[in-house]
Amino acid sequence: MIKNPKVLILTAHYGNGHVQVAKTLEQTFRQKGIEDVIVCDLFGESHPFITDITKYLYLKSYTIGKELYRLFYYGVEKIYDKKIASWYANFGRKRLKTLLQVEKPDIVINTFPIIAVPELKKQTGISIPVYNVLTDFCVHKIWIHREVDRYFVATDHVKELMVDIGVPAEQIVETGIPIRSSFELKVNPEIIYTKYQLCKNKKILLIVAGAHGVLGNVKELCQSFMSVPNLQIVVVCGKNEALKQDLLSLQKQNSDALKVFGYVENIDELFRVTSCMITKPGGITLSEAAALQVPVILYKPVPGQENENAMYFERKGAAVVIRDDSEVFAKTEALLQDDVKLLQMKEAMKSIYLPEPAGHIVDAILAENHAEPRHIPIKSPALAQSFT
């Protein structure tokens, strides 16, 4: 029995989702008394210049580079078995070998498709358990490697896709995608209405605009929605200060109809009171929406995993997917007026959600490695005051 295993979690800063999952797992390990946990951005530490370029191209996929990203995502899927695996497997290898030699972890977890560790296992025969935590509602072959001991996935649908491409079913565990613990707490909504100056007798539309130009023509949309009676619009701009300042000038015209925020630490609070949300179809955001049963309108998904995520939620009846700017206002207004449809979407979200994914993943990993967890109780935090 390993009383205090050392855990290495490998991730990457392509969007915030992969890192957020890594941090959630880290916190869950610590809550269970496993304190020796390291989170490492392997690619960023190994090749910072190349990583910065690829991160820039990734962000551009939301605006001008959609076709380029489509070619990359689906092109890699087609040729992965041939050539790209050998190149990708060695990316970050030097830094990884140093990490393994210095830190000597007992367990390695990937929240980004990094195959350097399983490839090293294959080539050198080192014995270290490797776990992949998939962060979308689809699967790309780049996640798959024979030396991965276990895969933790979002849904039975993802499990079926993996079995179809040859992964043994017993290596795949359906747990859901790890989300922040705040999304799984019970909170009195009355406090939230007061905190954000919202009216519980009106419909609330949450727009998560993001910091990278993910959602276009936000100001024009807000102007249109402000004309809808009995509706409050809440826009979260993230770290996009220019967008925030632009919308604050609009808010002055009707501060009851439009509420503008920058970065909101406890964004789960807004999820809890919104009638529906316009956002992008990232795996983590969708998992958080499912946890709180928030109907979503998914705006112009980027080809690749976001499009696959969007199609899955659309098939399940939990999302409306909009691919044309001209449809955003009409389809959103129609949904807000259709209480039956909103309720059906909430029920669909409920059917997708699997509770406490991080806890189940950590428990499974510790059990497989005969580690002894020591639960440390954590108080439910009071409502945070940090929003700008």
Swiss-Prot record:
SUPFAM superfamilies: UDP-Glycosyltransferase/glycogen phosphorylase. Its EC number is 2.4.1.315. CDD domains: GT28_Beta-DGS-like. GO terms for cellular component: plasma membrane. GO terms for biological process: enterobacterial common antigen biosynthetic process; glycolipid biosynthetic process; lipoteichoic acid biosynthetic process. It is found in: Cell membrane. Keywords: Carbohydrate metabolism, Cell membrane, Glycosyltransferase, Lipid biosynthesis, Lipid metabolism, Membrane, Transferase. It catalyses: a 1,2-diacyl-3-O-(beta-D-glucopyranosyl)-sn-glycerol + UDP-alpha-D-glucose = a 1,2-diacyl-3-O-(beta-D-Glc-(1->6)-beta-D-Glc)-sn-glycerol + UDP + H(+); a 1,2-diacyl-3-O-(beta-D-Glc-(1->6)-beta-D-Glc)-sn-glycerol + UDP-alpha-D-glucose = a 1,2-diacyl-3-O-(beta-D-Glc-(1->6)-beta-D-Glc-(1->6)-beta-D-Glc)-sn-glycerol + UDP + H(+); a 1,2-diacyl-sn-glycerol + UDP-alpha-D-glucose = a 1,2-diacyl-3-O-(beta-D-glucopyranosyl)-sn-glycerol + UDP + H(+). Pathway: Glycolipid metabolism; diglucosyl-diacylglycerol biosynthesis. One of its GO terms (molecular function) is 1,2-diacylglycerol 3-glucosyltransferase activity. It comes from the Bacteria. InterPro entries: Diacylglyc_glucosyltr_N, Glyco_trans_28_C, Glycosyltransf_28_UgtP, Pro_diacylglycrl_glcsylTrfase. PANTHER family: MONOGALACTOSYLDIACYLGLYCEROL SYNTHASE (PTHR43025), MONOGALACTOSYLDIACYLGLYCEROL SYNTHASE 1, CHLOROPLASTIC (PTHR43025:SF3). Processive glucosyltransferase involved in the biosynthesis of both the bilayer- and non-bilayer-forming membrane glucolipids. Is able to successively transfer up to three glucosyl residues to diacylglycerol (DAG), thereby catalyzing the formation of beta-monoglucosyl-DAG (3-O-(beta-D-glucopyranosyl)-1,2-diacyl-sn-glycerol), beta-diglucosyl-DAG (3-O-(beta-D-glucopyranosyl-beta-(1->6)-D-glucopyranosyl)-1,2-diacyl-sn-glycerol) and beta-triglucosyl-DAG (3-O-(beta-D-glucopyranosyl-beta-(1->6)-D-glucopyranosyl-beta-(1->6)-D-glucopyranosyl)-1,2-diacyl-sn-glycerol). Belongs to the glycosyltransferase 28 family. UgtP subfamily. This is Processive diacylglycerol beta-glucosyltransferase. It comes from Bacillus cereus (strain B4264).
